[in-house]
Regions:
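Metal-dependent nuclease catalytic regions and adjoining charged, substrate-binding loops involved
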Residues: 8, 12, 173, 186-271
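An acidic intrinsically disordered interaction segment
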Residues: 9-25, 140-154, 221-228
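Nuclease catalytic cores
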Residues: 18-19, 23-63, 103, 128, ...
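Active-site-adjacent bridging/hinge elements
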Residues: 24-30, 150, 156-161, 232
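Short acidic (Asp/Glu) and glycine-rich catalytic loops that position anionic groups and cofactors
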Residues: 28-34, 160-164, 203-214
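Hydrophobic (often cysteine-bearing) scaffold residues that line and stabilize catalytic clefts
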Residues: 43, 47, 102, 142, ...
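A non-catalytic, helix-rich entry segment at domain boundaries
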Residues: 54-128
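Non-catalytic protein-protein interaction segments used by genome-maintenance enzymes to assemble
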Residues: 126-190
Length: 271
C-alpha cells in the first residue's frame, strides 16, 4: 500500500487542493506555495479528524468480524478528542462551542452511528487507503485517501466517504460532489476498471439530536472527464502563478486560516 505521508512529500494535487484552489487561489498560494503556517486550527477540522479515526477503527474491526458497540466508540472518541484537543490553545472554537461541547456532541453522534448503521453483508476491502493516479497532461500525481471501500456479494464496489455536517446534504450536493467523482476515476485506475462502482456519503449530522444518513450516487464517464478537466485547469492556473482570491465575504472567509495574511495582501503589505 502506498504511504500518504510519502506521497505528500512530492509535488502533487488532490481533490481537496483542487477545490481549494478554485474556491480561493490566494489561500492556496499562502499554504501550498508560500508555505505560510496556519494562523489557527479550525475546530471542525480537529473534530472531523477524531470522528474519522473512530470510524476507521470501527471498520477495521468489522473487517475482522467484530462489530464494535456504541459505548466502545464513545470511549474511543473521548481518547481521540483528548489527544487532539485537550490543552490545545491553537484551536479556534466557534462561538457557543468549546472542548466539552464537542466531546459530548461527538459521543452522541457515534452512539447514533452505532445504533443506525445498517448491518451489511459485505467484504471490507480497504480502510483509510491512500491512492495515487496519473492523469494525461498532469505532470504531478493526483493523490487521495479512501475512507472505506467495500464489496457486496454480487461484486459491486462501493467507495464510502465519511462526513460530518451541520445539516443534511441535498441531492445536488451529493450528485455534484467533486471529490467522489475523482475517487471513482482513481478506483478505475487502481484495480477496479470494469467493475460496477457505487459512491456513498455516510454523514453524521450535527443537529441537536444527531442523525446518521447515507447517500448513494453514481458518476458517468462524461462526469469523470469533466472532473479531470477541472483538475487540469487548476494545474494550468497554478503553473502560471494565477492565484485569484475569493470574493470578500465568501463562505470560506470566516474559517480561513490565513485571514491576517489575506488582510496584509489586500493592503499591499504582501506581494
Amino acid at each position: 500500500m502506498v504511504d500518504l505521508a510519502e506521497l505528500r512529500k512530492e509535488p502533487h494535487l488532490s481533490a481537496s487542493s483542487v477545490s481549494g484552489y478554485l474556491e480561493c487561489g490566494l489561500a492556496y498560494r499562502f499554504g501550498k506555495i508560500d508555505g505560510l503556517a496556519p494562523e489557527f486550527t479550525p475546530d471542525v477540522l480537529v473534530f472531523g479528524s477524531a470522528i474519522h479515526e473512530v470510524l476507521a477503527e470501527y471498520y477495521r474491526s468489522l473487517a475482522q468480524g467484530v462489530r464494535l458497540a456504541g459505548e466502545h466508540l464513545k470511549e474511543s472518541f473521548a481518547k481521540q478528542w483528548s489527544e487532539r484537543a485537550a490543552d490545545n490553545d491553537f484551536i479556534r472554537y466557534k462561538e457557543g462551542t468549546d472542548y466539552r461541547s464537542y466531546l459530548s456532541q461527538g459521543q452522541e453522534m457515534l452512539a447514533v452511528f452505532a445504533s443506525q448503521v445498517p448491518v451489511e453483508e459485505c467484504t471490507v476491502l480497504a480502510v483509510e487507503e491512500p491512492f495515487s493516479m496519473d492523469l494525461e497532461g498532469l505532470p504531478v500525481p493526483l493523490i487521495g485517501i479512501y475512507d472505506l471501500v467495500i464489496e457486496d456479494s454480487s461484486g459491486v464496489i462501493t467507495i464510502v466517504d465519511h462526513k460530518t455536517s451541520a445539516k443534511s446534504y441535498s441531492t445536488a450536493q451529493v450528485d455534484q460532489n467533486f471529490q467522489m467523482t475523482v475517487y471513482q476515476s482513481a478506483a478505475k485506475g487502481n484495480g477496479f476498471a470494469g467493475r460496477e462502482i457505487l459512491l456513498r456519503l455516510d454523514c453524521l449530522i450535527k443537529t441537536k439530536t444527531p442523525r446518521f444518513e447515507q447517500y448513494y450516487t453514481t458518476r458517468s464517464q462524461e462526469e469523470e472527464q469533466g472532473a479531470l478537466k477541472r483538475v487540469l485547469a487548476a494545474w494550468d492556473g497554478i503553473s502560471k502563478g494565477v492565484y485569484l482570491p475569493a470574493n470578500t465575504g465568501s463562505w470560506r472567509c470566516p474559517g480561513c486560516v490565513y485571514q491576517d495574511a489575506c488582510g496584509q495582501w489586500m493592503r499591499g503589505e504582501l506581494p
